[in-house]
Curated annotation (Swiss-Prot):
Keyword Magnesium tagged: yes
Catalytic residues in the record: Y176, H229
Record's protein name: D-mannonate dehydratase
Reactions it catalyzes: D-mannonate = 2-dehydro-3-deoxy-D-gluconate + H2O
GO molecular function terms attached to this record: magnesium ion binding; mannonate dehydratase activity
Note describing how the cofactor binds: Binds 1 Mg(2+) ion per subunit.
Pathway(s) served: Carbohydrate metabolism; pentose and glucuronate interconversion
Top-level division of the source organism's lineage: Bacteria
């Protein structure tokens, strides 16, 4: 990948040098929509943060532009904690995905600036390396079991040693996670939500057969993961977890809607399949009970939706006390800016488990030059000061915002379900 072009400077001792003089919101669509905040100090150092919220990008962009940017100008970029507290506590209507994604963009941009001022990569600021590379998992999918198995083989050839597997459900026209026409899977595909039809009994029938075949074809040398995408009741999720036990999954993700944390008590009582949840969480309060009661094995929050590095660090520390590991969301609905910051976090955090990783489009990689690299099943962050990702604004301007929304789901009788 091309290297970030932003210049660095020695650590600035003057508060005037650190004064924020500009903060701009950039919305671009190099294959999909991304929202980026770019902050500049008086000394000319810039930092970037991701604020992308899939299907609700302009809501976060407006929140940033109207509520946060005016309050950034004139502040000391080095006072990261104080700025985080100002925006979190100052928002009477606190938490929620829009607020926390906007705060995250500010927070990550400020950490990026701090790394550049110090001349240090972000992982060093956090406390240094805990590992040489972050284990990542890719996404293999197919219209049926055989096609998914072939895709798993292709991902193994690319070097992945952990792979999420999804397959089409017989009798269902469109299944979550299944790409069309050989293109990467992208659920936000139209200006208005598309409707999909779902059958839980059909799904519960095919998934165990999928993993039985994958173990037969690929053995025990790879880690296999699966995402139920919030579609099951607690007892249905418990049944699936039990049925998957012979195939030793790395985890079963988002088995049931996560609003009711106590629902996971039922799942936990019936299966030893490891559980992961949290990509829709926005704060520690969304998962406090899950972690305290050890109802999950992996927490899936993402830096961009959970208030940035400052808050996610607290969440990870809390999880470590209860032997819960990180497994951050990392699909292409987050920009390379978020991936870069997450990778530095993964390199440092002691209770790391795994990192989701989907390949961004060539257009997105060009708009967001970065220094992280994939080798032998792991992502390796670079040594560029900050988080190592920049934005090419001239190139970003060539890709204007395109309205796209996530689908909705109905059961076979027409009842609304959880997509």
């Amino acid at each position: 990948m091309s290297q970030p072009s932003d210049s660095t400077a020695p650590l600035q001792g003057s508060a005037r040098d650190r004064e924020i003089v500009e903060a701009r919101v950039i919305v671009t669509c190099p294959g999909r929509n991304f929202v980026t905040l770019k902050i500049r100090t008086r000394s000319g150092i810039t930092g970037v943060g991701d604020a992308t919220l899939n299907g609700r990008e302009l809501a976060v962009a407006a929140y940033l532009q109207e509520h946060l940017v005016p309050n950034l100008i004139g502040r000391d970029a080095g006072r990261i904690e104080d700025i985080w507290q100002f925006f979190y506590r100052g928002a009477y209507w606190r938490r929620g995905p829009v607020t926390m994604s906007a705060i995250a963009a500010v927070d990550v941009a400020l950490w990026d600036i701090l790394g550049k001022m110090a001349g240090m990569p972000l992982y060093q600021l956090l406390g240094g390396r805990s590992r040489e590379g972050a284990l990542v998992y890719g996404h293999a999918n197919g219209r049926d079991i055989a096609e998914t198995s072939d895709e798993v083989g292709r991902f193994r050839e690319m070097g992945f040693i952990a792979i999420r597997a999804q397959c089409g459900v017989p009798g269902i026209k469109k299944t979550y996670g299944i790409s069309v026409g050989g293109k990467p899977y992208e659920p936000a595909e139209s200006e208005l939500p598309t409707e999909t039809v779902w059958s839980t009994p059909r799904y519960l029938g095919v998934v165990p057969r999928l993993f039985e075949q994958l173990r037969a074809d690929h053995g025990d040398e790879i880690e296999l993961l699966h995402d139920a995408h919030h579609r099951l009741t607690p007892i249905e999720a418990a049944r699936l977890g039990r049925d998957l036990e012979p195939y030793r999954l790395f985890w079963l993700e988002d088995a049931t809607p996560a609003e009711n944390q106590r629902a996971f008590e039922i799942i936990r009582q019936h299966t030893v399949t490891p559980l992961a949840v949290g990509e829709v969480f926005n704060s520690i309060w969304d998962c406090k009970h899950l972690i305290e009661q050890q109802l999950i094995d992996y927490i899936r929050t993402t830096i961009v939706h959970a208030g940035g590095l400052t808050h996610v660090r607290r969440l990870a520390d809390f999880a470590a006390l209860h032997q819960v590991r990180t497994g951050f969301h990392g699909a292409t609905d987050l920009s390379p800016v978020c991936m870069g910051a997450a990778l530095h976090f993964d390199t440092w955090v002691p209770n790391f488990g795994i990192q989701e990783y989907m390949f961004h489009s060539d257009e997105a990689n060009a708009v967001f030059p970065h220094d992280y690299q994939f080798r032998a099943g792991r992502l390796h962050c670079g040594e560029t000061p900050g988080h190592g990702v920049d934005i090419d604004e001239a190139l970003a301007a060539r890709y204007p915002y395109t309205p796209k929304q996530l689908p909705i789901l109905r059961l076979e009788d027409g009842t609304m379900g959880d997509w």
